[in-house]
Curated annotation (Swiss-Prot):
Exports glutathione-coordinated iron-sulfur clusters such as [2Fe-2S]-(GS)4 cluster from the mitochondria to the cytosol in an ATP-dependent manner allowing the assembly of the cytosolic iron-sulfur (Fe/S) cluster-containing proteins and participates in iron homeostasis. May play a role in cadmium, zinc and mercury detoxification. SUPFAM superfamilies: ABC transporter transmembrane region, P-loop containing nucleoside triphosphate hydrolases. It holds the Pfam family ABC_membrane. One of its GO terms (molecular function) is ATP binding. It catalyses: (glutathione)4[2Fe(III)-2S] cluster(in) + ATP + H2O = (glutathione)4[2Fe(III)-2S] cluster(out) + ADP + phosphate + H(+). Signal peptide: none annotated. Residues 45-64, 703-724 are annotated as: Disordered. Glutathione binds at R306, T307, Q308, F309, R310, N369, F370, G371, Q372, G419. The gene is abcb7. Belongs to the ABC transporter superfamily. ABCB family. Heavy Metal importer (TC 3.A.1.210) subfamily. It is found in: Mitochondrion inner membrane. Residues 20-131, 190-250, 303-364, 422-743 are mitochondrial matrix. This is Iron-sulfur clusters transporter ABCB7, mitochondrial. It is a multi-pass membrane protein.
Length: 743
């Protein structure tokens, strides 16, 4: 099939990763993408929009007749790009962006069963005692609450007993008045007692609920850290965070609903039905149960029907928000192609859908409220008619009528919220589904049972790759039978073109991934056979993009060894050549580095990364293009720090700039996933037609064409670009909801 060309002039950019996912989903669609600058490569997947809705597409098409707009719409129509992935498992979304890795959902019964283990933990007898006390207080509150209508009944009967069918206080004896007064006081005590039991129940059960939420959230957090790197690379971190947040809030709501609403209401319904059956007869209980059943069935059915309108409303709201934010963030692009009218009409299309769905939501809510009132009124009227007949026949008193009326009206209050509670409980279970589905995900990188720790010293820290094959996607080999050895205490560099597998070697060595074939050894021990913690403790990494925590410089330095002393931190800062720069900062080591370290320059961030790697003090050090984004002056200073650091250590340098690894003991050149050349710098240069010599000459010719020295990369400009991308990401993440469910 002829490929669909998406030209650059249309202003439409798409990630390569997004393209690969599209090609996996539909083999009939092929696309070529162009990238105008580095920021375009890193745009979020949700910056593309689904415009396949015929009604929305036709309205937009009619109002925009510019050729550029039509090209964009035509491209989107054929590609069927999705705006975002829903994290609610029962709402048409999924936890995985990869269709080959769709996670199995956890049904509601398993969710409630798993939640019960946290509410009734075997190792916490204090929490179990609180649950028992809470249930006892619940029963006490409902029994006391049911006593209130009885107090009314006795008061009315006492005041009415001397006057027949007419209530006449002037003729009532003092004893009757005294008894009625006592009964009315009992009524007040009953109401007060019911409120007291309810509040005590809330106070006692609060610790159980919060402890359950904390333990579940902690377990999910630890589980996510134990999952393999492939899982995290295929997910949006913001979506994971929202999934955990929604799931924990869902747990809180379900516990509250079960303990404070659904459970008490069900108990009170059974209690009232039993009382009416015992005091008034089976027909009273039958009418009551029939009314409550019809009320519940109507509420559940209408609420389920209304949910679709709520979903449509939220989806349109999210789409309108995303469209507005994306349009404003791309203000210049809109101006370049005169598409202001197109953007406005597109935005208005989403608002029209929102308006229509909102009206449906409001009107169906009115219908729900009316239906509930009608059902309850019919049932209450039937009960009152039966009670009146009983009074006329002499089998019931006026007090019985008051009691029956009071019992039913007490039930009406929690029943009024049944629709809301049902809808929110249903949504909470969906949110919890996502949370517990995350817990059910199994990592691909598993540690063997009773695996011994890796035993390695700097003198024995050899690294050996033995016929290693690896592929991220089936059929696309990244490493194709790679074998090499790094002697202990030596510096070995790995170079090659983009996609040759350089960074993959670092990930395999750290066991972020497993090779499909072959073995990797450290100090003669297969890394598959040793404990993960000991393996990763023995290897230090200085990444290309040093990401720092939003905390102080001291915290980020100490992160290399959280048990280190302050003097140790200062020592490694001096070794990395950043100590003096820190002392010049306003708050010195207490200076906040900002989100991802954006308040520091690129060189400062790399020095912090080097310092904390020194503080870790591992026998093996890996440098993954640690200076590729820095200017030559900063790079030279950092390389000097690295030389001091790698003395007597086994070190592997993944390099893009060959000038940084000329002093390596051995250089390994990768080409198409294989070891193409090996040797030191001079040996490889002296080899006629070698890949290394070609790379060296190419890089030198670029430097010479730009002058005697390579032009420095303006760090502050790069920093501003990072800040801009960060701001854009935060704005996009601020759009709440997934649009595929009633969140």
């Amino acid at each position: 099939m002829a490929p669909l060309l998406v030209p650059l002039k249309c202003g439409f950019h798409m990630q390569r990763r997004k393209l690969s996912l599209l090609l996996q989903r539909s083999s009939a669609v092929q696309a070529w993408t162009f990238h105008d600058h580095r920021a375009a490569n890193k745009r979020k997947e949700r910056n593309t929009y689904l415009l396949s809705d015929p009604s929305r597409e036709s309205s937009t098409w009619a109002n925009n007749r510019g050729q550029n707009s039509q090209q964009i719409l035509e491209a989107v129509k054929h590609l069927h790009l999705q705006e975002r992935q829903c994290w609610h498992g029962n709402a048409g979304g999924g936890l995985s962006a990869d269709p080959k890795n769709v996670l199995k959902e956890v049904n509601s019964s398993k969710i409630l069963g798993a939640m019960f283990t946290y509410v009734w933990p075997k190792d916490r007898p204090d929490l179990r005692a609180r649950v028992v006390i809470s249930l006892s207080l619940l029963a006490g509150a409902k029994i006391t609450n049911v006593m209130v209508p009885f107090m009314f009944k006795y008061a009315v009967d006492s005041l009415n007993q001397m006057s027949g069918h007419m209530l006449n206080l002037s003729d009532a004896p003092n004893t009757v008045v005294t008894m009625a007064t006592a009964v009315l006081i009992g009524y007040g005590v009953s109401r007060t007692g019911s409120a007291l039991f309810n509040e005590l129940r809330n106070a006692v059960f609060g610790k159980v609920a919060q402890s359950s939420i904390r333990r579940i959230a902690k377990n999910v957090f630890l589980h996510l850290h134990n999952l393999d790197l492939g899982f995290h690379l295929s997910r949006q971190t913001g979506a994971l965070s929202k999934a955990i947040d929604r799931g924990t809030r869902g747990i809180s709501f379900v516990l509250s609903a079960l303990v404070f609403n659904l459970g008490p209401t069900l108990f009170e319904m059974m209690l009232v039905s039993g009382i009416l059956y015992y005091k008034c007869g089976g027909h009273f209980a039958l009418v009551t149960l029939g009314t409550l059943s019809a009320y519940t069935a109507f509420t559940v059915a209408v609420t389920q029907w209304r949910t679709q309108f709520r979903i449509e409303m939220n989806k349109a709201d999210n789409e309108a928000g995303n469209a507005a934010i994306d349009s404003l963030l791309n203000y210049e692009t809109v101006k370049y192609f005169n598409n202001e009218k197109y953007e406005a009409e597109r935005y208005d299309g989403f608002l029209k859908v929102y308006e229509s769905s909102s009206l449906k939501t409001t009107s169906t809510l009115a219908m729900l409220n009316f239906g509930q009132s009608a059902i309850f009124s019919v049932g209450l009227t039937a009960i009152m008619v039966l009670a009146s007949k009983g009074i006329m026949s002499g089998t019931m008193t006026v007090g019985d009528l008051v009691m029956v009326n009071g019992l039913l009206f007490q039930l009406s209050l929690p029943l009024n919220f049944l629709g809301t509670v049902y809808r929110e409980t249903r949504q909470a279970l969906i949110d919890m589904n996502t949370l517990f589905t995350l817990l059910s995900v199994d990592t691909k990188i598993k540690e063997k049972e009773m695996a011994p720790p890796l035993i390695v010293t700097p003198q024995e820290a050899t690294i050996r790759f033995e016929d290693v094959y690896f592929e991220y996607l089936e059929g696309q080999k990244v490493l194709n039978g790679v074998s090499f050895e790094v002697p202990a205490g030596k510096k070995v560099a790995i170079v090659g073109g983009s996609g040759s597998g350089k960074s993959t070697i670092v990930r395999l060595l750290f066991r972020f991934y497993e090779p499909q074939q072959g073995n990797i050894y450290i100090a003669g021990q297969n890394i598959r056979d040793v404990g993960l913690e000991s393996l990763r403790k023995a290897v230090g990494v200085v990444p290309q993009d040093a990401v720092l925590f939003h905390n102080t410089i001291f915290y980020n330095l100490m992160y290399g060894n959280i048990n280190a002393t302050a003097e140790d931190v200062y020592r490694v800062a001096r070794l990395a050549g950043i100590h003096d720069a820190i002392l010049k900062m306003p708050h010195k080591y207490d200076t906040q580095v900002g989100e991802r370290g954006l308040k520091l320059s690129g060189g400062e961030k790399q020095r912090v990364a080097i310092a904390r790697a020194i503080l870790k003090n591992p026998p093996i050090l890996l440098y993954d293009e640690a200076t590729s984004s820095l200017d030559s002056v900063t790079e030279e200073n950092i390389l000097t720090s690295m030389k001091e650091m790698v003395k007597d250590r086994t070190s592997v340098f993944i390099a893009h700039r060959l000038s940084t690894i000329v002093d390596a003991d051995e250089i390994i050149v990768l080409n198409q996933g294989k070891v193409a050349e090996r040797g030191n710098h001079q040996t490889l240069l002296d080899t006629p037609g070698s890949l290394y010599a070609n790379l060296w000459n190419t890089q030198n010719s670029r430097i010479l064409s730009n002058g005697s020295k390579p032009e420095p990369v303006p760090e502050r400009v790069s920093q501003k670009e990072e800040e801009r991308k960060k701001l854009q990401e935060e704005i996009m993440n601020s759009v709440k909801g997934c649009g595929n469910c009633s969140c």
